[in-house]
Each structure stands twice: as structure tokens, then as C-alpha cells.
Amino acid sequence: MERIPSAQPPPTCLPKAPGLEHGDLSGMDFAHMYQVYKSRRGIKRSEDSKETYKLPHRLIEKKRRDRINECIAQLKDLLPEHLKLTTLGHLEKAVVLELTLKHVKALTNLIDQQQQKIIALQSGLQAGDLSGRNLEAGQEMFCSGFQTCAREVLQYLAKHENTRDLKSSQLVTHLHRVVSELLQGGASRKPLDSAPKAVDLKEKPSFLAKGSEGPGKNCVPVIQRTFAPSGGEQSGSDTDTDSGYGGELEKGDLRSEQPYFKSDHGRRFAVGERVSTIKQESEEPPTKKSRMQLSEEEGHFAGSDLMGSPFLGPHPHQPPFCLPFYLIPPSATAYLPMLEKCWYPTSVPVLYPGLNTSAAALSSFMNPDKIPTPLLLPQRLPSPLAHSSLDSSALLQALKQIPPLNLETKD
């Protein structure tokens, strides 16, 4: 029968195998085995972790940059045009951010101001906050009220100008009524404004009718004239007489306290008589007719101002009347009587250069101390009635002896 060694106890003769003690295991070095195994797994794990970290980081950075660029583009679109025009060329990101910041600050200041105004309006205006504005507004209101009151007073006085028993209480009542109408809205204000205007329009046509009547009557002598007046007429009478604004006729009428059209009617009659007498003396009217002297009838209407003034004196608007040499040639002796009667009271004192034989004859007709120049009439002539009737035969003889005029004669 075979022996099973596992079932049998160990033989006692065999020596016991020495066991491994803890002290012996502690002295053994297993570092090389452990180090090789750990390094392989650590390297593999670190490489995988780095790859997995780099991929999300790049995506995150890209997304962040895309968001920044998108926001800057939107800000660029939202910026006002006047801010965009401040820079030239392409707007960079930094420029867009600066302009956005500037615009936001301006909007913030504006919102703050509006907020302050709203708070001030809600809480009521404090005393002294807007003192300057209140003062200006008060002055404007006072000026407008004063002008309105003055206009109403003037219109009321113009409306009741002919009323003698006008009282101040009536004016005050009228002003109170106007104030009440203004407070109600001024709907009934328009009839009050139109009433004084109607009164003024009624008064103006009457005044214009009087004014048109005056100039029309004063201009009657001018219309009836059949020949053009000369400069002597303007120097002899006031030019305002024909224009209807007064003159010597009106001065004389004010003294006598009579209507001017009465004296003007007499003047028309006198002028008509004078024109008819002139036409009877000469068949054809002279080319130039001037009132260089006044008859007794004309002097009655002209007044003392004209007679006191120098006869044919210098007029501020008219040069003195001159007679050139060539107007009266020696062969024109037939017209001398007409000249004597029409425009010169006495014999015609015409001097020619080189006049020897007629000097004595002419000196007898003229005053030695008032000898006129060859071209200018005397400044002061005596009245035609003061002179005796002088015969012009001597003057005619002297003029016949005058040789023909020389073209080189000097003035």
C-alpha cells in the first residue's frame, strides 16, 4: 500500500525550512520593480490629461473673442453719426470703445439733469432757485401789460375825442372791462379794436377831402396859365402856395381869419384879368412870361411879405435871371416895346462891349450908382409907378448905331 505523503505528517528527520522573517523582508530593495511600473502609467495619464485640457481652452478663448468682436460691432452700429464723423478712416475697436464711453457719459449727464428738473417740478420750485428767470419773466409781463393798457387808453381817447364831459371813471371802467375780456380769452376783444379804427378811418377821409380841396383850389391859377412860368415867379412867391401846403395866401388868410378859398377865388379872377390884358397887348403870347413885378391888385393878395422882400432877389432854388447879349441883336428893335411892357418896367438897359456913342444916352436912363452888369438885371428896381413915362427913342437910336455882334465877345 502506497503512502500518501500529504496525509502523513512530515517526517521528523527532515530539517525545518527556515521561514522569512519581517526583518529580512524589510532589508530587501524592491524599488526598481515599483519605479518602472509607476512611471509608465503616470506618463500615459499626464499626456491624456493635457490633450483633453488644451482642446476646451482653445474653444473657450475663441468663443470669448467672438463675443467681444460681436459686441464691439454692435456698439459701432449704435453710435451716433456725429461721433463717427469725429474720426477719419476705419474705426478701430479701441476707438469704438472710447466713443461709446463718451456717448454714455453724455447721456448720463442729460438723464441726471432731466431727473433734477423732474424732482424740482414735483417738489415745487424752491425760493431763489430761478430768481433771474422769474425777474425777466416778470419784466416782460409788465411791459406787455403796460403796452396793452397804453394802447387801450389811446384808442379810448381817440374814440371819445369830441366828448367834452369825459371822466376818468369812464376810462377806468373801460380798462376793467378790457381786462376781464382778456382774462376770458379775448374773444370779445376784436370788436373793441375795430371800433377805434373805424373812427380813425372816418376822420381820415374828411381830412383828406379838405386837403384835396385845398391843393386843388390853390392849383387853379397854375392850370389856367397859357404859357410856362419862368424863374421870376418862383422867386416872387412861395412855392408851397401851388402845392396846397400854405404860402403867402394862407398867411394873409390867417390874419384876416377868412377861408382861403375866398381869397383864392379873388386871386383867380385877378390872374384871369392879367392874362387877358397881356393877350390884348400882344397878339401872340411871349415865349417867357415871368411875374417880375406885381400890380396893385396882385400885391393885395400877395401880402406884405412879398413887397418887403427884395425885388427879384436871389432865391434859394432859382439862379438870378440873366439876359445874354445875343438875345437882342441890333435888328430886333421892333420887339423892344413888347419887352418893356411884358418883363421889364423901364427901358431895357442892354450894354454891348465897345459901345461909345450910346453910352451917354444909356446913362441918362439908368441910375449911375446902380448900373447893372451886361448879363444881370438889377437886384432892386423901383416901382413902375415911381418912374415917369420915358420915351425909348433915344435908346432905339443908340441901338441902331451898334455894329453887328462879334462872335468872340466875352461875357
Curated annotation (Swiss-Prot):
Domain Orange: 142-175
Name of the featured protein: Class E basic helix-loop-helix protein 40
Species, as recorded: Mus musculus (Mouse)
Name of the gene: Bhlhe40
Molecular function as annotated in GO: DNA binding; DNA-binding transcription factor activity, RNA polymerase II-specific; DNA-binding transcription repressor activity, RNA polymerase II-specific; E-box binding; MRF binding; protein domain specific binding; protein heterodimerization activity; protein homodimerization activity
Main location: cytoplasm
Gene Ontology cellular component list: cytoplasm; nuclear body; nucleoplasm; nucleus
Record's subunit section: Homodimer. Heterodimer with BHLHE41/DEC2. Interacts with ubiquitin-conjugating enzyme UBE2I/UBC9. Interacts with HDAC1, SUMO1, RXRA and BMAL1. Interacts with TCF3/E47.
Family annotation (Pfam families): Hairy_orange (PF07527), HLH (PF00010)
Cellular compartment(s): Cytoplasm; Nucleus
Residue location of crosslink Glycyl lysine isopeptide (Lys-Gly) (interchain with G-Cter in SUMO2): K167, K279, K288
Function: Transcriptional repressor involved in the regulation of the circadian rhythm by negatively regulating the activity of the clock genes and clock-controlled genes. Acts as the negative limb of a novel autoregulatory feedback loop (DEC loop) which differs from the one formed by the PER and CRY transcriptional repressors (PER/CRY loop). Both these loops are interlocked as it represses the expression of PER1/2 and in turn is repressed by PER1/2 and CRY1/2.
Keywords carried by this UniProt record: Biological rhythms, Cytoplasm, DNA-binding, Isopeptide bond, Nucleus, Phosphoprotein, Repressor, Transcription, Transcription regulation, Ubl conjugation
Necessary for interaction with RXRA and repressor activity against RXRA: annotated segments: 75-79
Record region (Disordered): 1-20, 227-294
Cross-link Glycyl lysine isopeptide (Lys-Gly) (interchain with G-Cter in SUMO1, SUMO2 and SUMO3), sequence positions: K159, K279
